[in-house]
Amino acid sequence: LSFEGLKALGVPDAQLKTFPLPFQQGMAARAEQLRDFGPNAPENWEDVFKPGNCHLALTIYAVDDAALDKALATARTELDQSSGVTLIGEHRFGAPDGAKNPFGFRDSISQPAVEGSGVDPLPGEERAIKAGEFILGYESENGQPLGMPEPAALGKNGTFVVLRKYNSRVGCFNAFLKAHGETAEDRERLAAKMFGRWRSGAPLTLSPDHDDPDLGADPQRNNDFNFKDDPKGRVVPLGCHMRRLNPRDSELTLLTDVNIHRIIRRSSTFGPVYSEDVAPKDDAKGDRGLFFIFISARAYDTIEFMQQEWINRGNFVDLGEERDPIVGLHEEDGRFTIPQAPARKRIDGVQTFNVMKGGEYLFMPSLSALKWLAEQR
């Protein structure tokens, strides 16, 4: 539920005011904090995401297409029978190879374990993260529960969700690789340097010279690494996508507790599978992209921090204004630095390869909160 959705459900003002300010304002109003400028600015978003339009986001998962069609039909029938509810848009997630992102890289490999969930950390995760970082009402990494909406029946066991939709400019990405790589091997190596992993998901740290599909597919190994032996980023560049969004034990100029910025995420890809034959002219179709969805008890703070400091700036690893080569906003040609001896290699011409098409801050209520909300009607 968005803040406007809670208002439409009749939540009293006294309770609405207990929600955090960024959530109350909505994602579009936080464009400056999110660095959603230029092509990513709210005025360029799809209508469904324009301010005030989206009240509720319903996600339906199923084991196969037939089960999904059945679930969607049921949902549409129930919506049609519900007074005061209008379906303003829908999007079918799930590319043919949904485990990979639009650029052909295996995605959603690194996820934090949650303390008390019964799921042990995989090799490479030092320890489980306090449950209060993800679910409201429990101990967080600072030793105390984070603030939550009141009353407790509304806030406790709920969480916040960030939803962001991107169109992926796969053709421009391919053209960039071809402009800076003479051979197919050169292009694959550059792409891996930009992501921090090979397409299979194998981390550069463990397989620096070539892809290793067996390693990439093994959850007991594909996340079992750190950066202590690569402080200068000569194997995994300091500014690559993976190292920015999960610095692990990297030495950071901007001091922060990495664990308070961990998220449980799901990137849902849509559109045709990746092909190296996709050209820049094909990007105009807008048929490839992903929904970036994550939950966190401080989701609004985390995404704004990530967008400001880790994605659209490089000061925290002494890279100045250099930005994330995959999801950063490059209003002019950007730069990507690959540290190497004797001199680092700088590659110009990085573009905005993922263009923002809309998003919203959402509150995911608990079962007790759903009951409380129903009682307000």
Roles of regions detected by a PLM:
Residues L1-R377:
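Long, low-complexity, Ser/Thr/Gly/Pro-rich intrinsically disordered segments that act as flexible linkers
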